[in-house]
Amino acid sequence: MEMKEPARLSRKKMFAVIGILAGILIALVIMLYLMIIALGNRNEANLLEAGQALHYTYDSHNAPNGMTLHVLKTRPADVTLETINNNITLSGKVGINGGFFYGEQLLSIGVVDSIPVNKEIGSFGTGSENVKYARGTLVWDGASDLLSVQVASKASELKVKDHTRFWAQGGISMSLGDDARWVEQTVKENAPFPGDDRLRSAAVYDEAGMLYLIVSETKGTLASFREAIIQTVGEGKLVDGIFLDGDGSSQLLSSDASLPGDNRPVVQMIRIVK
């Protein structure tokens, strides 16, 4: 009996089979992508699991000038300064970036209870001074539970009631109470790239002594960032604050938001710990 050769698939059926196989492959790729995203989100949630009990609130604001701000509001007593040498979004720690740095050297004041936060590095870049310039430094006096901005070159110049109960974060004066001369002050303090559109960070406080840690999602000049803060943060009751390191160093992590800047590591952060 003569065996017939199996009929070849028609061109139409062949395209149909190829289409089905391609569809299955695309579906598998999408499922794998979603699994990776879900795993990443779960890992971030696990990292911040202990942070869910922290005393802070998160909010975001779209300012009239187009800047989008992410804000962590907390009490200064619930905050510390910490060296991390990592991107904040990878640290598992709630907070934002801190002062200026170069390599692993901290170029801004960063002290807690009179101890420089980067003291392990040696004699330079420890956080004991605002290198080269007297700059606006946000100071929390634990004895009086009050915040202030003091222009200083060295941490030893700062005025507090008890030098064993305070923290101080260096930056650039924002001069919220002096709209006429704030730009002049930033020039004195050599604020970097004030006219460029860059990511920005800041720490400000209100009349009730609440602390606002702010990172922009959109780029803007120093002036537009300051304007956005005045317009959207603190319900018109802000007292003063400082600009922090910016651009790729502008980073934030909370259970609600994750802003990695340009993914670079930063030396130091302002961390919410209570």
Task: Outline where the language-model segments fall.
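Beta-strand-turn-beta hairpins that frame and shape the catalytic cleft
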Residues: 64-67, 143-146, 206-212
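Conserved, well-ordered active-site substructure
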Residues: 106-130, 189-205, 211-244, 249-274
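Mature, Sec-exported extracytoplasmic domains of Gram-positive
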Residues: 59-66, 75-77, 104, 175, ...
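Zymogen propeptides
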Residues: 2-143
